């Protein structure tokens, strides 16, 4: 469950970095 959140946050940071 946490993995999904972490992955989502990472992707958001990479895209909206």
Swiss-Prot record:
Induction: Expressed at high levels equally in exponential and stationary phase in rich medium (at protein level).
Origin: domain of life: Bacteria
Full protein name: Protein YchT
